[in-house]
Amino acid sequence: SVDYQGKPTRVFAYYSDPDLLANRPHGKKKYAGVVLLHGGAGWAFRQWVEKWAAEGYAAIAIDLCGNGPEIRPLPDGGPNLGDDEAVFMQAENGDMKRSWTYHAVSSAILAHSLLLSMKQVDADKTCLTGISWGGYLTCIVAALDNRFKAAAPVYGCGYMDELKFFDYGMSKLSADGKARWMRDLDPSVYLPYVGIPMLMVNGNTDTAFDVPQYQKSCRLIPQHFREVCIRPGMRHGHYEGWEPAEIRCFFESAVGDGYPPIRITDVSLDDSLRVSFRTGIFPYSAEFYYTNDTLSDNAHRVWHTVGGTLNREKGTF
């Protein structure tokens, strides 16, 4: 990858595809590809790669902490996500090429280039997904690398100066340092330039990425590209972040033969709430999930659910 402190770096990755998984030679068949970006306390997860390979994709997961196999530091690895100095404090001195974000974004784009160079990968069908800090990166990379055809950041969003979870880093910055972070490293700067379909996935009571800032981030994405999936009770973690079937279904709609997600086309509120939607499939059931709790923090906010009348044929609820 790109130089760090004047020296070349290498990045460890796991790669697999349906042929490798089945222990057979590559033939003429080309597969859709996916780049996988882990979050904090994570690494290049082999099982994540194998999960996507089992679902028909050529998948690559890269380590974003300068580590190699068995999570051991590489002698020529880049900065570590666990190092607050690399993640936050480079914004203080303005040396962005030493920041973790710069190196992680570069590594993700180069991993995509590697994927595209493989004869078994369909260059017109590559996707991107990341979890937590990897979701943060996905928001940035999707805006910078227009070779991707779809992206799905999980948890990660912009306006990190408003998210209390990240006070541990943001509070160390001066006013100028924080302004520099928000100008150069915050996803809110990049999301308006996303030019591919993007599915934003989060839980309603996430401990790090709050719903209000998530909503603001989603609205920065051009309307015809953005989809959002807020899952009730979704916990924060790597397994929880790669488990949602909505991600694969979304990618299938972008690079395969799948149906597009349900899209709400109109909302009216008087004595009742009425939602109109458009979809290529008939939903099995529907519920209205809401909160009027304005006092609790995001993780402890109380949500309620109420049923209604679903008309599959007319596309109303």
Language-model-derived ranges and their functions:
Residues 44-46, 50-106, 158-169:
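Cap/lid segment of the alpha/beta-hydrolase catalytic domain
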Residues 221-238:
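Catalytic histidine neighborhood in serine/cysteine hydrolases
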